[in-house]
Amino acid sequence: MKHLFKLDPAKNLPMNDLTKLVHSGTDGFIIGGTDNVQIEAVQKLYELLGETDLPIFLEISNESMILPEADHFLIPVVLNTENSKWTHGLHQELIKEMGAFIPWKRVTAEGYVILNKDAKVAHLTEAKTDLTDEDIVAYARLAENIFHLPIFYVEYSGMYGDPEVVRKAGAALSNTKFWYGGGIRSKEQAAEMAKYADTIIVGNIIYEDLEKALETATIFRKKTV
């Protein structure tokens, strides 16, 4: 997977726009959000995407994101916070409550480093965003070599990140997949971050300028002679 669209169930998107996203050349979708997430909206969005053969990931920020019928679940583990609630606290509580029913083969953990200090998710998780390049590289190595996380996710959350930081983080990883998300609003930015990340995630621009969002996926289409 090189490209994923991230959809917020709290935001409305016409069916025609969803159809365009499905046929854009993207490799799949993440359904996830921070604010005002209701299970009914998650269910509706998941069902609207249900006709596609593309993978649909539910990113579990709270219990309202859990649909038992989903094929793929993403579990964020925020690495750059001192609040253990976001590294393992909420996770342990949910496992305690539902552990016997969790379909572990459909669950993937992602090690998050959140780097936009103004983002809602940074405030919510109390993320320490004032990091050096060396700090971020160390988190990448921590994710891969200590926690053995399958995904390391650098999240600028609405702000376009520093390509050099992304390059260094990606170069530090061998087996863990490197995902980048944040502020991609053009095919040029998509191509730039795709040089360093295994997968780029495109979100906000979907709701701001759909055509530009679609262009970010077209760069990955296989060319035919």
From Swiss-Prot:
SUPFAM superfamilies: FMN-linked oxidoreductases. Sn-glycerol 1-phosphate binds at K6, Y153, V154, E155, Y156, S157, G158, G183, G203, N204. Homodimer. It comes from the Bacteria. Gene3D superfamilies: FMN-linked oxidoreductases. Its EC number is 2.5.1.n9. It catalyses: sn-glycerol 1-phosphate + all-trans-heptaprenyl diphosphate = 3-heptaprenyl-sn-glycero-1-phosphate + diphosphate. InterPro entries: GGGP/HepGP_synthase_I, GGGP/HepGP_synthase_sf, GGGP_HepGP_synthase. This is Heptaprenylglyceryl phosphate synthase. Pfam families: PcrB. Its cofactor is Mg(2+). Prenyltransferase that catalyzes in vivo the transfer of the heptaprenyl moiety of heptaprenyl pyrophosphate (HepPP; 35 carbon atoms) to the C3 hydroxyl of sn-glycerol-1-phosphate (G1P), producing heptaprenylglyceryl phosphate (HepGP). This reaction is an ether-bond-formation step in the biosynthesis of archaea-type G1P-based membrane lipids found in Bacillales. The gene is pcrB. Keywords: Lipid biosynthesis, Lipid metabolism, Magnesium, Metal-binding, Phospholipid biosynthesis, Phospholipid metabolism, Transferase. Mg(2+) binds at D8, T34. One of its GO terms (biological process) is glycerophospholipid biosynthetic process. Belongs to the GGGP/HepGP synthase family. Group I subfamily. Pathway: Membrane lipid metabolism; glycerophospholipid metabolism. GO terms for molecular function: heptaprenylglyceryl phosphate synthase activity; magnesium ion binding.
